[in-house]
Amino acid sequence: AVQCECYFPMTPFRHEPPTTQRLMQCMRHGKACLMRLQVKGLRQRFKWWGFPYIPLAKVRHCEGYINDNGRLLSADHFEITITDIDFRIIAKEYDWDSLNVLDLWASDYGKLPKPLTDCVKESYTGKTSLKGVPGQDLYYVKAKGDLNSYYGMTAQDPLQLDTLFDEDDPDNLWSECADDPEGSYNDHRPHLFLPYQWGVWTTAHTRK
């Protein structure tokens, strides 16, 4: 439903001046924004709210924080990379002393291509109409798998590092070769036929 009904980044991302003022301008103009933020003095607006939004696993350089089952109740300092959708949710749930925009990219919102959404709708119709129908188990599983794959194809890791096997080192048989991550990305990029950002925004929309 998200991929059929919601809007996604549809133009190449443009690098914007990393300022709070420019971020607000981009969001007022309805741009899809990807940002890296530094936040100081974070705290919940409503301390009895039972489901804090920011996951501890997604922040970096976090200091002086209170962790509630993997979620941030407060923090003295941290960095995080989020979308404009995430930012709006965080702004409703939290207050902070200061916020610095370290990096900012913007794209234009639009609907996903009709051929893609038509495939999603067809698989969804098949999945829901075949569920529980005697003798249709195989077709139900196939339709369900197809439906899941449309998201999966947008969420492939864009940086596939080479894996090395060293039979002479039993304690470290497998290791990732990270000597040239940019080269690995460029080698893998031709296989990414659906934009990775569509997968990012799919999950962001579901969190609203």
Q: Where are each of the predicted segments found?
A:
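Conserved acidic
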Residues: 1-208
